[in-house]
Amino acid sequence: MNRNEISFIYYVKIKLYLYNSFFIMSYIEMVLAIPLLGAIALLFVPSWKTQTIRNIALNSSLLTFLISLLLWIEFDSSSALFQFTDGVCSPNVYSDVTLAKAASSSSFSALNFALGVDGISLFFIILTTLLVPICILVSWNNIEVYVKEYCIAFLVLETLMLTVFSVLDLLLFYIFFESVLIPMFIIIGVWGSRERKIRAAYQFFLYTLFGSVLMLLAILLIYFQTGTLDIEMLYLSDFSETRQCILWLAFFASFAVKVPMVPVHIWLPEAHVEAPTAGSVILAGILLKLGTYGFLRFSIPLFPYACIYFTPLIYTMSVIAIVYTSCTTIRQIDLKKIIAYSSVAHMNFVTIGLFSQNTQGIEGSILLMISHGLVSPALFLCVGVLYDRHKTRLLRYYSGCGQTMPIFALLFVFFTMANISLPGTSSFPGEFLVFIGSYQNNSFVAFCAATGMVLGAAYALWLCNRLIYGVSKPDFINTWSDVNRREFFMFAPLIAGILWIGVYPEPFLDAMHCSCIYLLYAQ
């Protein structure tokens, strides 16, 4: 055989190997691999082929979303264990084996890039894969510089976020938990909308990074005591009450900044205001959930005594955040800041439910996080629709826009009503369960949190009145077009999700129920 024939044979063998390797992947491995492969493919596309770049990014993210739906279809809701895993021991079945393995581990060679999905991480994965193609669509026309780098940043960010929700090793969780900051820092700093975008990017990066230093030290302490960082093995470990409190505070320092809780929330409004619309969508829809997901995945099951001990601290900080940010929201004139401060209030309502020490509160918190991941991005998309037309986010310029943009007005009112938990929308069942769970644990806290709901309705109705029904400025808005087809396609899946959860939340609650019970009573 000549050289060309040999080269062709090797080429065919490599293609067959890659083909077979791809199709023997588990669903979760495919979900992680596709956006990363899309980002790698974009490296070889010339920068001037912007339409090709956008198509590759959109198709990669859409394919990832479709495969993530297969996770839900194949998911066994009767099991509390991690699913779609390869070679990961189940703590309920192999408890003696895993404990022996943990005791015998003596080096970081025991680190294992194991992936798995349970009823808690399932919906965060689906939510992530849903929002990324929406981000690509919203940036279709308004990102004109460094388009290739922009799409690569979002696809890499998607891979990192999905890995955070699916990795089963504590140190690897920390690595990807912090790695998410890098592409988001670039997105805010390069494609932000105003002169202060560099300051906002550094503020976002440094606030969230410094809070995680103590968490890294806590992870090392956990490893030296248990000899393992495998999440399933750690659920079987036992820490003294004093050590639980120390470790809990170290994890709290990292997760509280990500939520964010008062007083470490200052970075969020600035980051939202300066970020491009797609950056705000990801920031509100996914990145704010990383902190509460960390509480749920680690703080509650690993440190049960410390959770009970520090519950008054969580309740106090959460109630202050809800009331303070709700009052602050009423005084804002920037549309993005209004939505950003309302996000702080909603996420602190989530923390109240997480530490209610009962399944109603925890399930309600997860449902509320999913709802917030649909409603808040939708509101930021609405602001983006207005910003694309006149490059300002100040409320006073858009008074009476409902007269010239009736479809937009209908969408904005719908999403605003969902934001204040109108029955029939996605926020209502989540907030109702959180209220029931917190009332069972502390009725006074539930009452204080309910005042935040009233304040939320006040600023939401005030916003609708000013924006939709105010006195119009004909010279400013008469030439605007209403929501176009591309923009409606962005809103459609969010509308469907909000109505589905609001009318029929049972499939979501069924999938997460066993996992919530297991985490709550893991020890």
Curated annotation (Swiss-Prot):
InterPro entries membership: NADH_Q_OxRdtase_chainM/4, NADH_UbQ_OxRdtase, ND/Mrp_TM
GO molecular function list: NADH dehydrogenase (ubiquinone) activity; ubiquinone binding
Compartment(s) where it occurs, according to its Swiss-Prot or TrEMBL record: Mitochondrion membrane
EC numbers on record: 7.1.1.2
Protein's UniProt keywords contain Transport: yes
Keywords: Electron transport, Membrane, Mitochondrion, NAD, Respiratory chain, Translocase, Transmembrane, Transmembrane helix, Transport, Ubiquinone
Chemical reaction(s) catalysed: a ubiquinone + NADH + 5 H(+)(in) = a ubiquinol + NAD(+) + 4 H(+)(out)
GO biological process, one term: electron transport coupled proton transport
Segments crossing the lipid bilayer: 22-42, 62-82, 120-140, 149-169, 170-190, 204-224, 246-266, 276-296, 303-323, 338-358, 366-386, 404-424, 444-464, 488-508
Top-level taxon in the UniProt lineage: Eukaryota
GO cellular component terms, A-Z: mitochondrial membrane
A Pfam family this chain is assigned to: Proton_antipo_M
Membrane topology designation: Multi-pass membrane protein
Family: Belongs to the complex I subunit 4 family.
NCBIfam families reported in the protein's UniProt record: NDH_I_M, PRK05846.1-3
Function: Core subunit of the mitochondrial membrane respiratory chain NADH dehydrogenase (Complex I) that is believed to belong to the minimal assembly required for catalysis. Complex I functions in the transfer of electrons from NADH to the respiratory chain. The immediate electron acceptor for the enzyme is believed to be ubiquinone.
Protein name per the record: NADH-ubiquinone oxidoreductase chain 4
Gene: ND4
